[in-house]
Structures are given as structure tokens and as C-alpha cells.
Design a protein with these regions (language model features):
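Short, intrinsically disordered, charge-balanced linker/junction segments flanking boundaries
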Residues: 1-2, 169-179
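Glycine/threonine-rich beta-strand-loop-alpha-helix active-site module
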Residues: 2-97
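Gly/Ser/Thr-rich helix-start
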Residues: 13-15, 61-63, 112, 169, ...
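Carboxylate- and glycine-rich phosphate/diphosphate-binding segment that chelates Mg2+/Mn2+
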Residues: 68-174
Length: 179
């Protein structure tokens, strides 16, 4: 609070960026409770103090382009979703080179996460002419490159990073909850 940043930059995979989204809300509204933050599409207006930039280093959650954040309470084993277009980052930096150092287990897990998001966007009851092309292209890209990416093909790893972002743009606008 004393520092007063006008930009918050989150770098990492889904969990660090999701945590930074929650911290951004707390920075803008110090008195907001976690329960209030969890009210679906009930966030207060953000960007009064700071804008938000997300730099993704993994290829799965696409949180850098979505209106969602998942905060996990590991002690209770509960995942709390935050959902509001207010927490969509202002700037997303999707540099495929950042994903090239992911361990293969993470490549597999995040790749399946991206595929799930793309399929979910396509079959969503809120899909539309804008979300379907993004979802279908992401599905095609993931189908063609996930195994190659897992096997160390860096061009495929780059493609996966872009595909997960397309899937994120699709599901953030077609909404979630089916798959």
C-alpha cells in the first residue's frame, strides 16, 4: 500500500498468476473479504489504483487472458473459483520461449488442461461465432502438437503455448462448467 504501484506484473504458471489476481483485488479494495471475492461476477470495479499484466510460463490454464482465478486451500482440499471480467489482465505476454523449460510431466498436465478448456468452450451452451473458431483451432493445434511437445520438440512446445492462449480466450468468453 505504501509503495502504490500503478501496474501489477504476475509472472509464472496458473497458480502464481491466479494468486496475483486475488492480491490485485485486495490491493484495490483492502477491506474486501475472500467470501466477497468469491461471489461470481460480483467483483467491484478494478483499475482505480493499478492495471494488471500477466506473463505466462506454462501452457495450460491461460489465466493470462481469462476472467477466472482459482485459489486453492490445500489444508481443506478446496478450490475456490474467482470469476469476473474485472480480473481479466489488461496485458498478456505470451512468449513461447518461457514455456520451453517446462518438465515433461508439466507439459502433459498443462496440455490436457488446455485441451479440456478448448473442448469445454466449444460445447458450452454460451458458445458463439466468436468463441467456436478459437476453440476449434486450439483443439486442432493441441491435437497436432501435444505429443511432439512432450517429446521435446520446441516448435511444438511453442505452438502449445499459443494454443492454450486461444483456448483461454475461447473459454473465458464461452464460460465454463461442463467438462
Amino acid at each position: 500500500e505504501e509503495y502504490g504501484p500503478d501496474w501489477i506484473v504476475a509472472i509464472g504458471g496458473g497458480s502464481p498468476i491466479d494468486a496475483a489476481k486475488a492480491m490485485w483485488v485486495k490491493y484495490e479494495y483492502p477491506d474486501i473479504t475472500f467470501e466477497e471475492m468469491c461471489k461470481v461476477f460480483g467483483m467491484p470495479k478494478l483499475r482505480k489504483k493499478a492495471h494488471f499484466c500477466a506473463v505466462s510460463s506454462t501452457s495450460g490454464t491461460a489465466t493470462e487472458v481469462t476472467a477466472f482465478s482459482v485459489i486453492t486451500d490445500y489444508e481443506k482440499g478446496i478450490k475456490y473459483p474467482l470469476a469476473d471480467f474485472e480480473i481479466t489482465p489488461d496485458v498478456a505476454i505470451v512468449d513461447p520461449e518461457l514455456a520451453e523449460t517446462m518438465p515433461v510431466k508439466l507439459v502433459a498436465h498443462t496440455g490436457m488442461d488446455a485441451m479440456t478448456h478448448a473442448i469445454e468452450a466449444y460445447v458450452s451452451t454460451a458458445n458463439c461465432d466468436y468463441t467456436d473458431p478459437l476453440a476449434l483451432h486450439a483443439i486442432k493445434m493441441i491435437h497436432e502438437t501435444l505429443i511432439k511437445s512432450y517429446n521435446g520438440d520446441m516448435a511444438a512446445r511453442d505452438s502449445m503455448h499459443n494454443a492454450q492462449c486461444l483456448a483461454g480466450m475461447a473459454f473465458s468468453n464461452a464460460l465454463l462448467g461442463i467438462v
